[in-house]
Amino acid sequence: MTSGFLEFTVSLSAHPVTDAERESILAEPGFGKYHTDHMVSIDYIDGRGWHDARVIPYGPIQLDPSAIVLHYAQEVFEGLKAYRWADGSIVSFRPDANAARLRSSARRIAIPELPDELFIDSLCQLIAVDNAWVPRVGGEEALYLRPFIFATEPGLGVRPAKQYRYLLIASPVGAYFKGGINPVTVWVSMEYVRASPGGTGAAKFGGNYAASLLAQTEAAANGCDQVVWLDAVERRFVEEMGGMNIFFVLGSGGSARLVTPELSGSLLPGVTRASLLQLAIDAGFSVEERKIDIDEWQKKAAAGEITEVFACGTAAFITPVSRVKYGDTEFTIAGGAPGEVTMALRDTLTGIQRGTFADTHGWMARLG
């Protein structure tokens, strides 16, 4: 197979799963539990650039124990989904935005940038051999694509590596939360922070997620599904949820207003977030990006001014938030039921991604 940037070699798996095994997995995929038969690998060496692009059987990789990624976490990743349309084509939602964000993340972690064209080609190459893993038309299922770059050079000196590897793996997925579109309960972390100004919060960097795990454990211990992060300086402004951006709906009907935390440099610029802002404008809603105080959230929810809250991201898609906990405080949003604005935006975005609504912004890209 030939890319416009590099030529890909293809080595097919000698032991792919059977059709029956695959269908059994696709019937109940979970999230990230199973992987397709193949993966993409591309190497980088300083002075030579990206090279040796190949599709190979999915399996363990060999890594030196002193590889810089294992000691200094020089790694970035992305996440996007592939969908099967009724006409048989396989498409993805705004992969160009994921390619651009991977480059932005790489710059922040001193990793060489993977060209957008090569990123998109890698998706197409994997879909070409593993297209049978893309779930059936309709439903909540999709094929989750996980591209990532990590430092492979051995050495214990603290410096950017000179050798890297790009891998692309894929996993069939269902709903991110067990309850599907049922509203979730969130825990506001008052003790821990995810990121700080000037840090790595705007990069899709594994270290940010590692830093969130203790708070996520705390959330689970308090009967919550996810963590809400506050800013690192004043510890009062809502930033995002674990791996997701957050939206607040004030008012209802055609006069509803959507508010989401502004991109401060310490939260992730989500592709779904940006898309929902545009879709809200298309639907005639006013939108605002600004700081949102946790006290404002509580008071306006109690007064009935905040009528809906939802989280959004590639993995969790659009998930309503019904209940909020922190310390001895607990409150609900509008009785805890999913809101009309939330569900309308969810239906619109779902329709675009599944090919049943008009893609007026040209967001869908064919992969196979």
From Swiss-Prot:
Protein keywords: Amino-acid biosynthesis, Aminotransferase, Branched-chain amino acid biosynthesis, Pyridoxal phosphate, Transferase
Gene Ontology biological-process entries: isoleucine biosynthetic process; L-leucine biosynthetic process; L-valine biosynthetic process
Modified residues (N6-(pyridoxal phosphate)lysine): 204
Enzyme class: transferase
GO MF, one example: L-leucine-2-oxoglutarate transaminase activity
Catalytic activity of the protein: L-leucine + 2-oxoglutarate = 4-methyl-2-oxopentanoate + L-glutamate; L-isoleucine + 2-oxoglutarate = (S)-3-methyl-2-oxopentanoate + L-glutamate; L-valine + 2-oxoglutarate = 3-methyl-2-oxobutanoate + L-glutamate
Record PROSITE patterns: AA_TRANSFER_CLASS_4
Pathway info: Amino-acid biosynthesis; L-isoleucine biosynthesis; L-isoleucine from 2-oxobutanoate: step 4/4; Amino-acid biosynthesis; L-leucine biosynthesis; L-leucine from 3-methyl-2-oxobutanoate: step 4/4; Amino-acid biosynthesis; L-valine biosynthesis; L-valine from pyruvate: step 4/4
Source organism, top-level taxon: Bacteria
Enzyme Commission number(s) from the entry: 2.6.1.42
Pfam families per record: Aminotran_4
Family to which this protein belongs: Belongs to the class-IV pyridoxal-phosphate-dependent aminotransferase family.
Function (record text): Acts on leucine, isoleucine and valine.
The protein's name in its UniProt record: Probable branched-chain-amino-acid aminotransferase
